[in-house]
From Swiss-Prot:
Organism: Arabidopsis thaliana
Protein name: Alpha carbonic anhydrase 7
Major location (coarse): plastid
SUPFAM superfamilies: Carbonic anhydrase (SSF51069)
Catalysed reaction equations from the record: hydrogencarbonate + H(+) = CO2 + H2O
Top-tier EC class: lyase
Coiled-coil stretches: none
Localization annotation: Plastid, Chloroplast stroma
EC number: 4.2.1.1
Amino acid sequence: MVNYSSISCIFFVALFSIFTIVSISSAASSHGEVEDEREFNYKKNDEKGPERWGELKPEWEMCGKGEMQSPIDLMNERVNIVSHLGRLNRDYNPSNATLKNRGHDIMLKFEDGAGTIKINGFEYELQQLHWHSPSEHTINGRRFALELHMVHEGRNRRMAVVTVLYKIGRADTFIRSLEKELEGIAEMEEAEKNVGMIDPTKIKIGSRKYYRYTGSLTTPPCTQNVTWSVVRKVRTVTRKQVKLLRVAVHDDANSNARPVQPTNKRIVHLYRPIV
């Protein structure tokens, strides 16, 4: 005789296990930046624009309610100059990487271990990098042509982002090394392309000074408690390079920069080493 109670018990245990796995997977994916950015946009006063991000999904509510949101305006008169934070010690190495069109930006995702950066004694592994144009962060109210985000994640799943700002001028050598691949994506229907081994140490920072504050991801779900390190020196990029990063996205938009968010009495440090 078939024991239906045993079968029912096994069925419900299996169903519960599947539900638990899906829930954990969903929670993990909601922590970091979304992989597909087509569910929101950067159009002002649009139903999917920055002012409405927090209303689009329950898990995106921090975009509208968070008190530690990014980007912010880095005003010299408000920063606390310190020397104890230490240099940005990047311990990167070449890694296999993929260029991916996420809908509103181009992301360079590292498939293998690309190395780490140490902040406040904790190591954060480099996961990916992407660009925003114009810049999201401003310095004394000034917005720049381009902003690079190098996104890291620690073992505690907290995020750390190292940011480089660019003004129009000479070509950036790292972007120049990717120009052929970016042009290829611009002509492809596919959303991603493997670009082989990429060395993140080739990204030039050129300054030991940087701003440090606690903020959030600048795209949904706008997760907070992100450690931001914004390099003080503004580097250069050509108009052609900025345009190439936008054309490759295929979204016909002129901008993918979130508006500046209220600082809300947060402390912003400017690390300046003692000579």
